[in-house]
Amino acid sequence: MLKEFKEFALKGNVVDMAVGIIVGGAFGSIVNTLVSEVMMPPLGLLTGGVDFSNLYVVMKEGVEPGPYAALANARAAGAVTLNYGLFLNALVSFTIMAFSVFILVKAINRLRQKADAAPAPPSKKTCPYCLTLVPQQASRCPACTSELPGAADPGARVAAK
């Protein structure tokens, strides 16, 4: 049973998936920091000095009555809040992550299309007399025994060997 688990765990797909999850988590952390620490502060300044992480609505006051200066104060007082500013931060983070994944998938699909675009040369051709498929290098059709046009001289093939 341990051997079967080892084979399963070391399969390419499982290892690739694990690496993808780890890298995805790290990328998510970077995007969240980018949004909360780099993008939202200037956006807050443009909208009149608003800190989006402190945008909330008090649904029920806590032990100490409001108004509360910040979300942290409302939480410390035990107030029930609707934190729409944090939701806006998460929405911006999601949009950036989704767009990044879209660009990545689009690039991978383009690479796959290039690989699929180069088809292998045909291995068979059609006899013009009886329309039977014959090997590309055949000089005569096996069905109707007609000599095929464009075929190499059979004697030349033997002499070349």
Swiss-Prot record:
* Localization per record: Cell inner membrane
Q: Which domain of life is it from?
A: Bacteria
Which InterPro entries does the record match to this protein? Mechanosensitive_channel_CS (IPR019823), MS_channel (IPR001185), MSC/AndL (IPR037673), MscL_channel (IPR036019)
Membrane topology, from the record: Multi-pass membrane protein
Q: Where are the transmembrane segments?
A: 14-34, 85-105
PROSITE patterns referenced in this protein's UniProt entry, alphabetically:
MSCL
Q: What is its main location?
A: membrane
**The family this protein is said to belong to:** Belongs to the MscL family.
Record-linked NCBIfam families: mscL, PRK00567.1-4
Please give the subunit comment from the record: Homopentamer.
UniProt function note = Channel that opens in response to stretch forces in the membrane lipid bilayer. May participate in the regulation of osmotic pressure changes within the cell.
Name listed for the protein in its UniProt record: Large-conductance mechanosensitive channel
Species of the source:
Chlorobium luteolum (strain DSM 273 / BCRC 81028 / 2530) (Pelodictyon luteolum)
Gene designation: mscL
